[in-house]
Curated annotation (Swiss-Prot):
Keyword Nucleus recorded: no
Residues that bind Mg(2+): D246, E289, D316
Protein name as it appears in the record: Enolase
Lineage: Bacteria, Pseudomonadati, Pseudomonadota, Gammaproteobacteria, Pseudomonadales
Co-factor(s): Mg(2+)
List of catalytic residues: E209 (proton donor), K341 (proton acceptor)
UniProt subunit comment: Component of the RNA degradosome, a multiprotein complex involved in RNA processing and mRNA degradation.
PANTHER family: ENOLASE (PTHR11902:SF1)
Residues annotated to bind (2R)-2-phosphoglycerate: Q167, K341, R370, S371, K392
Coiled-coil parts of chain: none
Co-factor note (free text): Binds a second Mg(2+) ion via substrate during catalysis.
Length: 429
């Protein structure tokens, strides 16, 4: 049984040019596991705390030297000599050492980087692919599936400098037979969308997650452009390819109103639920994330009652990968799916617990990146190892996004005939 002999933290950069935390976990047999913590732009108020320095003279206050010092000091001292394969014990020890509800003392970014690095070191020590080790930790050994990618090809909201209010417009290749076929379909649509936008005289620069970020007349206009690109790529919208939205509604919710400034419209909760319902009737939208504000549980209930039987309603800012909040949502019949982001909760163990709780309640779990990413591709292994069935990791450009897709291609190749891709069966309705 290998032991942890050293842990090193360092400050590295994410895809937005902001500092983030990387950790190495070194074992007594020479194995090293490394992992980076991602960072979000539109964040839920109840997320675990990302510890930043606040020193305006360095990186405009966004440095992470405090988190790095916590890795190189108290976390290292705590975990030296421990078994890297005992993930639960490592994570619980760090959570206990932190002692706060939201990991404010050590920083969720510090704890998460070490948690994931330990898992990677353990997988190498056990001579297992990371996804197989994660499946074992999840209590589902050998139960894998390739996720349907939700590819964010038009960016708005906090992820782009344009007038589009909804944050993400995604395509899902639900009619593909394999993950690699689905990825190819999405890529072809992405390139056709560029041509569609160019033909309209629109900007084809990309946003934080690699999707195009033009100014458009309305959210419906964005959906129309994607529909045209799907058709030009030779696919049938609604059969081969479906659509998904991430409204990130908390970003345009104020004083009980949902304000679509790009369209000059304002709604109460019921009105905005009706607006979204209307979009699902005009386009084959089968998934909507954060359709209402994270605090508007009454509004969420209205939306769930209106379209929850047919549409996947994903809680991101709503549930923040937190089992306490998810449990309450399940009991109240709020939404029917959870977005899974490691750094919202801050450890691999707690992430797996959220996925398990969701699945036990009949909720789906969508594995997700953050808008501030690195080359770390752990979420690809998480999606396969938990058989989550869906992954959100951005568009088809920018290496911080494509690194996850490329890892999924490698895993599909490794799994061979066991690389199950369920397509439309992963969704409601």
């Amino acid at each position: 049984m290998a032991k942890i002999v050293d842990i090193k933290g360092r400050e590295v950069l994410d895809s937005r040019g902001n500092p983030t935390v990387e950790a190495d976990v070194l074992l007594d047999n020479g194995i090293i596991g490394s992992a980076c913590a991602p960072s979000g732009a539109s964040t839920g108020s109840r997320e675990a705390l990302e510890l930043r320095d606040g020193d305006k003279s360095r990186y405009l206050g966004k440095g992470v030297l405090k988190a790095v010092a916590n890795i190189n000091g108290p976390i290292r001292d705590l975990l030296l000599g421990k078994d890297p394969a005992d993930q639960k014990a490592l994570d619980r020890a760090m959570i206990e050492l932190d002692g706060t509800e939201n990991k404010a003392k050590l920083g969720a970014n510090a704890i998460l980087a070490v948690s994931l690095a330990a898992a990677k070191a353990a997988a190498q020590d056990l001579d297992l692919p990371l996804y197989a080790h994660i499946a074992n930790l999840n209590g589902t050994p050998g139960q894998y599936s390739m996720p349907v990618p939700m590819m964010n090809i038009i960016n708005g909201g906090e992820h782009a400098d344009n007038n589009v209010d909804i944050q993400e417009f995604m395509v899902q290749p639900v009619g593909a037979k394999t993950f690699s076929d689905g990825l190819r379909m999405g890529t072809e649509i992405f390139h056709h969308l560029k041509a569609v936008l160019k033909a309209r005289g629109l900007n084809t620069a990309v946003g934080d997650e690699g999707g195009f970020a033009p100014n458009l007349a309305s959210n419906e206009d964005a959906l129309g452009a994607i529909a045209e690109a799907v058709e030009k790529a030779g696919y049938k919208l609604g059969t081969d390819v479906t659509l998904a939205l991430d409204c990130a509604a908390s970003e345009f919710y104020e004083d009980g109103k949902y304000n679509l400034s790009g369209e000059g419209k304002s709604f109460d909760a019921e009105g905005f639920a009706d607006y979204l319902k209307g979009l699902t009737e005009r386009f084959p939208i089968i998934s909507i994330e954060d359709g209402l504000d994270e605090s508007d549980w009454a509004g969420w209930k209205i939306l769930t009652d209106k379209i929850g039987e047919k549409v996947q309603l994903v809680g991101d800012d709503l549930f923040v990968t937190n089992t306490k909040i998810l449990k309450e949502g399940i009991e109240k019949g709020i939404g029917n799916s959870i977005l899974i982001k490691f750094n919202q909760i801050g450890s691999l163990t707690e992430t797996l617990e959220a996925i398990q709780m969701a699945k036990a309640a009949g909720y789906t779990a969508v594995i997700s990146h953050r808008s501030g990413e690195t080359e770390d591709s752990t979420i690809a292994d998480l999606a396969v190892g938990t058989a989550a069935g869906q992954i959100k990791t951005g568009s088809l450009c920018r290496s911080d996004r494509v690194s996850k897709y490329n890892q999924l291609l490698r895993i599909e190749e490794q799994l061979g005939a066991k690389a199950v891709y369920r397509g439309r069966a992963e969704f409601r309705g």
